Amino acid sequence: MFGPPGRILEIPGQWYLTDFSQVEFIPGFQEGMRPAHDLLDRWKAIFDYAVANEEGACYAFVVHPQSIGRAHMITRLEELIVHMQERGAWFATLSEIADATERAV
């Protein structure tokens, strides 16, 4: 036993909500290097669907500094953040999301 029993909340990531698989190139394994607007369009579409159809949805996307930090990518992330802010998104850490979920359950 490692301690008293407790609750576990998993906040899963999704490959289609990560930047790495869309923009990085690994020869023989990963095509990557897709146009930056493709990623932005996909992320916006998924977010807009969640806003319209999934009350209380958690949109947990994953970004990597070596990928999203490039000039042409960081501007797309900024566009996504503005898009989300305009639609009332709550930006929170995973700990804050876990706490809010705990209070709601």
Predicted regions located by residue number:
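Active-site-adjacent pocket scaffolds in enzyme catalytic domains
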Residues: 1-55
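C-terminal domain-boundary segment and adjacent tail
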Residues: 40-105
